[in-house]
Every structure is written in structure tokens, then in C-alpha cells.
């Protein structure tokens, strides 16, 4: 089961109006929420794994990593309704080698809607669409 046209529109409209112009801020917030929820996963990121959580947002390696992730997510959002699943699946081999599994992607993606609601004016429809998108995108990775 994929996303509906209305869900894709909700995600893309919010993205283009509220996220596209502040990718770094959105990325930093999503990752911070993720690492707060799953602090043990900080070990996956050797370039900043020794940085305390409160110091991450000002760490250049953290900022570079979060920007890399959100730039790719930007491509995935553009491709919703098309090859978004294939784009996600393409990340499996390189991340699997680091011990990062589709489960980790799912944990991160499930937080996106909430972060967008808290910090980037996402409405409940968009938040719910992101919840469904997390499941659809992770399923495509398997």
C-alpha cells in the first residue's frame, strides 16, 4: 500500500513552503530528536560520537551529517508517488555496512512529522501523512 495523492500533496506542500528554505535547521532538529530518543545510536556517527548531546547543534561534523541526510530526504520527498522507495532502498547497502538498518531509518522517519509540527508549522494531516510515509518508505527498503 502506498501513499494517497492527498498524503503526497500534504507532505510536498509543507516541505516546499516550510522546510525547503531551512534544510539545515530542519535536519538538525530531526536528528537531535532522534538522538535524544535513541542516544545509543550516537555511536554510529564516529565523527561526532564523543560530542555530548547538548553540543551537537554547534558541531560542524554533526551539521554536515544532518545536511547530507536532509538533502537526500529532499530528493525522496520530490520523488513521492514515483521512485521514492527505490531511492530509500539504494541506501541499504552502504548503511548496512555501518550497522544501520531499515529499522533505524524507520525510527528516524517516524519522528519527522512530530518535529515538523513542533517546529515547522505542520498541520495534523501532514503529521499523519509523514507517519504513513515512514512505513511505506521503510517497507520499500526491505
From Swiss-Prot:
Alphabetized GO MF terms: heme binding; metal ion binding; oxygen binding; oxygen carrier activity
CDD domains in the record? Mb-like
Q: Where in the numbering of this chain does the Globin domain appear?
A: 2-142
- What SUPFAM superfamilies does the record tag this protein with? Globin-like
- PROSITE patterns named among the record's database cross-references: GLOBIN (PS01033)
Q: Where does heme b bind?
A: 95
Q: Does the keyword Lyase apply?
A: no
Q: Spell out the subunit comment.
A: Homotetramer.
Further details from the record: Hemoglobin F-I binds oxygen non-cooperatively and almost independently of pH.
The record describes the protein's role as: Hemoglobin F-I appears to function in storage, rather than transport of oxygen.
Q: Which family does it belong to?
A: Belongs to the globin family.
What is the protein name given in its UniProt record?
Hemoglobin F-I
